[in-house]
Design a protein with these regions (language model features):
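Short S/T/G/P-rich N-terminal loop/turn motif that feeds into the first structured element of a domain
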Residues: 1-49, 55-69, 76-107
Length: 107
């Protein structure tokens, strides 16, 4: 069963958040390329929710060293003032209109 990791991050400023998002775009495929889906949502001027889906807990655990490194970088370089995450089994998924989703960044 696929699992989701939902990370919440609160930044000191909107500029810090944007810089962190730009940094994440440059490393996502190399550091977290085994994620099945990644969706980042700006939930406020200085807050971000990141949803990453993995095929299993074991698959997600392979990213733990890079996840820690990423968290350390964003806390030091991009002034994250708070960060926490949840994880759990995905119990429902529907994506029939996934092709219609538009984003600020293109992969």
């Amino acid at each position: 069963m696929s699992i989701a990791i939902i990370t919440m991050m609160e930044y000191l400023s909107d500029k810090e958040m944007a810089a962190s998002e730009n940094f994440y775009q440059t490393i996502q495929k190399e550091w977290f390329g085994n994620a099945q889906i990644v969706i980042n949502v700006r939930t406020g001027p200085t807050s971000l929710l990141s949803l990453a889906v993995y095929s299993s807990y074991e698959d997600a655990e392979t990213n733990l060293p890079k996840r820690k490194e990423f968290q350390d970088i964003v806390k030091d370089k991009f002034t994250v003032v708070d960060s926490f995450y949840y994880e759990g089994d995905i119990t429902y998924f529907e994506a029939s209109k996934a092709a219609e989703i538009t984003t600020e960044w293109k992969t």
